[in-house]
Amino acid sequence: MKDKIIDNAITLFSEKGYDGTTLDDISKSVNIKKASLYYHYDNKEEIYRKSVENCFNYFIDFLLRNHDDNYSIDGLYQFLFKFIFDVDERYIKLYVQLSSAPEALNSEIKHHLQEINTTLHDELIKYYDPTHIALNKEDFINLILLFLETWYFRASFSQKFGVIEDSKNRFKDQVYSLLNVFLKK
């Protein structure tokens, strides 16, 4: 039941944010009484903490599962495409919602963000090949991270409004433009 509560809470927090999600919403989503939630969790903040932890664990697992050994420009394109469009949209939306998380959770969220950024940095650096890329390593990483953050915001809205296929086509064009910016001619 604890896993089901968290799974449903992730959906609710991703759609309504922390303040918009109530314990009543969570209890109704798993068909239990609100009082029964307290058997599993002390309060909404604990449920949110666990949801955020699961979100970041999902991202790290996704990164580690979805890389391949093709650390080429084509491999980078495939990696970026997967990291934008194959991630469960609930986690993207929850990630976007973190900016409005309770202030008491800032240090925990910052820790999780640092962990995911380290994992992502370590994965992206494998695609860096100075014989093909005109930027230095840090500029290359920063440009890719900026691109991913922008697309996460877009993807969260695209999925909400049902234009994901249009977004995929735009992504393809924009990632090629991005790659052309830093490839050596």
From Swiss-Prot:
InterPro entries: Homeodomain-like_sf, HTH-type_Tx_Regulator, HTH_TetR, IcaR_C. Coiled coil: none annotated. The keyword Transcription applies. Residues 1-59 form the HTH tetR-type domain. SUPFAM superfamilies: Homeodomain-like. Binding to the ica operator DNA involves two IcaR dimers and is highly cooperative. Homodimer. Represses transcription of the icaADBC operon necessary for biofilm production. This is Biofilm operon icaADBC HTH-type negative transcriptional regulator IcaR.
